[in-house]
Every structure is written in C-alpha cells, then in structure tokens.
C-alpha cells in the first residue's frame, strides 16, 4: 500500500549495543553470545545461560531486576539490560515491577536482523512525502489546542478520536499519571562516518543518553560530513512531550480509574 506513495529502500535494522568498551550485536543472538562468552554453538550458549540462572536460584521474582536475571542470567542482564532500562524509566530495576518484562527474546541463530518482518525498509528521502500524500484531501490543523477548539466547535464530527493523555482529557480529575519524556540533541560532525551503524545503544547507566543515531546509514548516503542524534530519557512535567507512561502498579491503578470514565463516553 505505502509503495503507491513513496519508494522504500531495503534498510534492515541491526543495532549495536555498547557497554563500556565492549560492542555487542542486537537483538540477543549467537553473535552476542559468541562475543560475550566465546561460545560457538546454540547448545553452548543455552548451557551458559541456564548455568547462570541456576546459580542465582531466584524463586518468584519480586522486581524487574530479579525477573531479568531469572530470564537471561547475570551477564546479559547486567551488561545489556540493567543500565539501559534504568535510564529509560529513571528508576532502579529493583524499584520496577517484575511484570514490565514478560519475556526477553533470545535467538540462538547468527542473525542480527532486529525484526522478523518479510518486508523491511525506510522511505527514501524521509517520511514527509509519504505523510503529505496520505493526507491529500484531508483537512489538517496544526498548532491547534484540542480543548478550546472542540469547546468552540461541538459536534464538528460524528465521531471523535482523542489520542492525547487521558488524564489531561479529564482535567487531571484523579491526579496526574506518570510519564517519561525524551530529549534529543542533533550534531553535525565534520567526518564521513562516525559510528559505522545507524543505531548504537549505550547500555551502561553512567552514560546519560540511551543511544546515538547516525542518520546517513539509513540510506547508505555518501558525504564528507555526518549528522548524529543523541537520545536522552527525561522526567516528564506538564507541558513536556509524553513519550510513554510509567508502567507500575500505582500508575496502572490510576489509569484504570480514568479508563472507567472513558468507557462512559458516548462517541
């Protein structure tokens, strides 16, 4: 369908994780395990993970840290999950609920393809052209606050789909939900190739950003300069962009109260 509007290249996302001075392939696969332990076969990798899990002897996980350790063992969790997760959520893994991680995909094949989709790629030249063509014939209003607009134009549509924050929609009646935000810093570098890959995740807690994106690798562009963007997790405050909600028991209980209100809406 989308190829009717733009041409897609054949980019395949194969991120790299950097922990201190060590580089690992993502998602967790045989290339990751071979670099970490020197193993060569799936059986050796599975045995190493099972050995570490058995040594920890964790019963019912009480928090995300115990859940992660029980799923993948100490090395993978501490090098590739713990610090990155704590940066994302702004909390210690010991203070996050176990249910945030249901499972951690481990692939016992030498394959760095992050996704399993048959068709993968990125719109050549970016997604602006695609968005413009998809929106042809559709009235779009930017820089428009939903609340005063809908108050001044009741019944403007037969059905309204609100995709903003549910607590804001109800005037924070039960209080604010907790969200996480992100901050991006983009920099032009006077070099042809900065990191050799589109995405490099920084998994240690002490590095303030979670990843660096080098944009030219999405389209294999050739130029004497390059642009990189660093992604920093941030606490959310009212007025900031909310990127994702904090998924814990307190927040979920508050969300359930707002959802009950939403279920009573007519349209």
Regions found by a protein language model. Give the residues of each.
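Glycine-rich FAD cofactor-binding loop and adjacent beta-loop-alpha segment at the N-terminus
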Residues: 1-6
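Active-site/ligand-binding neighborhood in enzyme catalytic cores
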Residues: 11-13, 17-159, 163, 167-170
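C-terminal segments that line or cap access tunnels to active or ligand-binding sites in enzymes
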Residues: 168-267
């Amino acid at each position: 369908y989308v190829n009717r509007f733009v041409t897609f290249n054949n980019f395949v996302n194969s991120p790299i994780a950097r922990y201190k001075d060590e580089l690992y392939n993502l998602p967790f696969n045989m290339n990751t395990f071979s670099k970490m332990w020197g193993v060569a076969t799936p059986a050796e990798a599975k045995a190493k993970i099972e050995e570490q899990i058995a040594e920890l002897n964790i019963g019912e996980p009480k928090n995300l840290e115990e859940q992660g350790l029980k799923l993948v063992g100490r090395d993978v969790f501490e090098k590739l999950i713990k610090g990155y997760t704590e940066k994302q959520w702004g909390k210690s893994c010991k203070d996050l609920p176990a249910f945030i991680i249901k499972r951690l995909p481990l692939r016992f094949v030498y394959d760095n393809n992050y996704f399993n989709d048959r068709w993968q790629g990125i719109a050549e030249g970016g997604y602006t052209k695609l968005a413009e063509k998809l929106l042809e014939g559709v009235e779009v209003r930017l820089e428009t606050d939903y609340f005063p607009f809908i108050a001044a134009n009741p019944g403007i549509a037969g059905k309204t789909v609100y995709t903003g924050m549910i607590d804001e929609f109800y005037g924070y009646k039960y209080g604010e939900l907790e969200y996480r935000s992100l901050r991006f810093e983009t920099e032009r570098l006077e070099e042809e190739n900065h990191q050799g890959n589109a995405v490099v995740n920084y998994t240690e807690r002490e590095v303030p950003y979670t990843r660096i994106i080098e944009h030219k690798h999405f389209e294999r562009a050739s130029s004497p300069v390059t642009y990189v963007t660093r992604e920093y997790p941030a606490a959310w405050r009212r007025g900031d962009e909310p990127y994702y909600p904090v998924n814990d028991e307190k927040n979920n209980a508050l969300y359930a109260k707002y959802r009950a209100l939403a279920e009573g809406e007519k349209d």
